[in-house]
Every structure is written in C-alpha cells, then in structure tokens.
Amino acid sequence: MSLKEDDFGKDNSRNIESYTGRIFDVYIQKDSYSQSALDDMFPEAVVSTAACVKNEAEDNINLIDTHPQFELVNTGLGAKSDDLKSPSAKATFTDKQRKNEVPNISVSNYFPGQSSETSSTTESWTIGCDKWSEKVEEAFLEALRLIMKNGTTKIKIRNANFGRNELISLYIKHKTNEFRTKKQISSHIQVWKKTIQNKIKDSLTLSSKEKELLHLIEHGAEQTTENSNLFYDIFEEIIDSLPSVSDSGSLTPKNLYVSNNSSGLSVHSKLLTPITASNEKKIENFIKTNAASQAKTPLIYAKHIYENIDGYKCVPSKRPLEQLSPTELHQGDRPNKASFSNKKAILESAKKIEIEQRKIINKYQRISRIQEHESNPEFSSNSNSGSEYESEEEVVPRSATVTQLQSRPVPYYKNNGMPYSLSKVRGRPMYPRPAEDAYNANYIQGLPQYQTSYFSQLLLSSPQHYEHSPHQRNFTPSNQSHGNFY
C-alpha cells in the first residue's frame, strides 16, 4: 500500500491505524548505517531507474489522488528517492545516522608511500559493529603495523611499561579521539583472527589486507631498526601529550580529577569504562559528606564511616562519649592536680575490678572441682566430707613475692618425693592413711595452718579412736614406704 505525501504532515499514529492493507514504513537512505551492509552484499550493483517501482505497481491499488508517490526501495540496493528529502520524512533518518562523524585522518606522515585501499574488505569492517567505524579500523591497523610483538613481555616507554593492547588503545585515542578499552581491543583481535582462520579453513580467497592483518596479529611488525625508531618516535610523542603516567604504567585521564576544594567527585573522562549513574552518585555523595564533616575524634569519624555503609548500624552506648579535642592531648602545659587525682581514681577502680574478677574466677573454679568430685566413680560416700577441704585450695595472690612462695609448707601428699596425680588426689580424703602417720611430728609441721589445727584437735586429742580403725587392715611396711593410703 502506498503512502501519500500529506500523511507525513499530520498525526502519523492516527493515519497508520486507519489503513488495513500492507504498509511499507522502512526506507533506506544512501550513506546510512544499513547501506554499508547492503553495499557489501551488492558491491558492483548499479542502481537504475527500473530498480525503484511505484507503490501502485506493487500493490495494484488505484489511488483517488494521483500526487507524487514515495518510491519504495527494491531488492535492498539502497536507492534513494528525491521525495524523501522532505523535512517530515528526513527526520526519521536522523536518529539512525551516526552522531559523531570522525574527521578524515591522513597517515602519510607516518607511512609514506602507503595509501588506504578502498576495497570491499575495508567497507566490511563496519558491518554489525557500530563501535568500530572505518576510521577506527584504519587506526587499529596502523597501530598493528607499528607495534612489534615480543611475546608476553611489555614494552618500556618513558620509564613505564605498556602492553600491545594498551598501546593500540592509546594510538586509536590519539588518532580518532575515540577510546577503546584493552578488553575491547583484545576481543576485536580475536574476532578478526577467528574470521580469517575460518576463511582459510573453508578454502576462501583472502584479500591482501586480511593476509596482512593475520600476519600482524600473530607475529607483529617486523623487528627492524627503522621500524623500532618509528615506533618510539610516534608513541613517545603520544605519551608526552598525556597528563601523567604512574610508575606502574597506568594512565591518569585528562578529564578525571578529584578536587578536594570542590564539592564532590567529577568523572567526565572518555578514557574510562562508563560506570553506572547510581555508583557515581554514591561516590559523589560520599565525597561531599566526607568533606563537609570534620571529625573531632577517631570514634566520631568511625561512626560516620559505618553509618554510610550498607549492612552496618551504629547503636548508641549507655555511657556518654567524652568529646575530647585532639589539641588537648598535645598541649605543652604541665598536668595539674586534677589530672593526678583522676589517674589515682582510675588505678583504684582498676584494682577493685581485678579483685572482683579474681573472686569470680575462684568461685567458678571451686564449683567446677566439686562437680568433678561428684562425677568421679572412685570418690566414695565416706570421703564426701573431705572433699570440702580439697575444693577450698589456697589461691596464691598475684602480688605474692618469691620469699613468700618459698616459705609455703610442702604438700602433704607424698609419693616417693613426688606429688600424686590430680585424679588420684581429688579422689581421696584430706586426712592421711594409715593413721600412724598422724603421730609423726614432722608430718604435722608440713600441713597448712587450717589443716594443722584440724588434725591437732581431731587426731592427737583422741588417738584411741584410730587404734582399731579399719584403715589399719592390710597395713604393711611396703605400703608405708610407698605412701599409699589404702
């Protein structure tokens, strides 16, 4: 179905809905993006007047008004009608055209005697890849002709190390003012290499540029003195034009800067991979809040940092934080009496806390020992009364001197001069067996204070009680010599 010229001057949506037949709404303008693909399909086709037909001839529809009709493009040859030059029709093609046209670049200064071939292969580089225009592809090929490949070893220029893809990126940026990342260049190289290898596998004919490109990708430029001098002359000039180069070889973009005096972070460089607007906004807000807030103490600064991080929450403590200014700690004035009194109070409170902690530790130690006695199967019911004395071990104070420790009595549990193991000691009563040891004067002197008084009253006052004690059974000198209690 044909469209009238007046339809483009009115509401298009309303007029298109009124049609019930087939509508051709796709037009191809010469030199457009899609035209490059069609020219590659028909490189030698010549558009004639017969290639364009009227709408009446295709749809076989008699129109009432015979105004000049739009010509539909036939067989995809890219013919353009003069009627498409109207402002209403031309507006539909402006969005599809490339907005940034790359200026024409002459490479005769660097490659004398070489002229760019205008073959179908050059035109096919732009097919399906809007980011790699013809100018960028030419700069890409020029960079490959300059850079010599040396395995994985980087090239040192101006005290900085650069890889091949990074140098290609710099050259493209310098020549076309369009930036390509190292990852984009690496992918582009792999695509070209795979495409050419597939052509070789299918026994297809390669053009001269494809052969040259495959050789440059695999082997790089020829390593001659002339090529080396040309390489360093060009890339030293490119690197000198850059703002700065760090020691690691990473470049500082021209338009990327962090202003401490400004209100935030400005990121406008085309040398960087574009970041999302949300991340950029977070960075700017963080810089603004960080510059605005002047933390008086490290605690306030840490609180400010954690409050701005997702997943963290600052809960106010019960004790108020002392607002100390950092200048107070660095004053050269002598400390007054108030500062000494504060230090003295702090030391006293620390001692009290230490005493309380020792009491708590001793309490839980006694509880754990009592529980161990109860769970010990060797511990009989007849000796339960003695476990109380065993659990009440004397706690050596931390402030005890060496002389006090040396003057402490020797333990009364003897095993040929060696103390018994802990499991055996805790399973036995406090008083020794056999009872004849109680009459030994040296033994009484070796007991602690509270045990000495206990045995003085209990054993020495009524020795007849132990004359016929059942513990005297099976008492032999051998048992006495070994110090066994049973």
Swiss-Prot record:
Chain positions covered by the region annotation Disordered: 372-410, 465-486
Compositionally skewed regions (Polar residues) per UniProt: 472-486
Protein keywords: Acetylation, Activator, DNA-binding, Nucleus, Phosphoprotein, Transcription, Transcription regulation
PROSITE patterns to which the protein is assigned, alphabetical: TEA_1, TEA_2
Entry keyword annotation includes Transmembrane helix: no
InterPro entries associated with the record: TEA/ATTS_dom, TEA/ATTS_sf, TEC1_TEAD_TF
A GO term for molecular function: RNA polymerase II cis-regulatory region sequence-specific DNA binding
Compositionally biased spans, kind Low complexity: 377-388
Gene3D superfamilies: TEA/ATTS domain
Function: TEC1 is involved in the activation of TY1 and TY1-mediated gene expression. It is not involved in mating or sporulation processes.
Family the entry assigns: Belongs to the TEC1 family.
Protein name listed in UniProt: Ty transcription activator TEC1
Gene behind this protein: TEC1
